[in-house]
Amino acid sequence: MKLLGWNSKDIGVDLGTANIIVTIKGKGIVLNEPSVVAIDKNNGDIIATGSEAKEMLGRTPDEILAIRPLKDGVIADFTATQLMLKSMIQKICQRYNAGRPRVVVGVPSGITEVEERAVEESVMQAGAKEVY
């Protein structure tokens, strides 16, 4: 079985401490955004991700939490990382009509097996057909 075949939508995600970079086969880099998420504390909804959320760091009302969920190469906030990743992948899939893509995710080297599984589940919940 080929990991990245010629007849499917394949996405690569670099889940970095500073930025998340997303590529689509044949299109190159389609997203390079800060690894930041803003979450409504009352209901857990995503308010913003990436550059928009970065602008909110230290400037949000009490009911909104803007954070960098990855710190020093590890996942510092497990839930926020899941929400951020899911939101960004859903946006890319919609914007580029990626349907249910196969996704390869590069994760920080220091994450635990539980965190790795959570990243995989987040990508699947975002609509991926397969995650590697």
Which residues does each predicted region cover?
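Nucleotide/phosphate-binding catalytic cleft detector across ATP-hydrolyzing
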Residues: 1-132
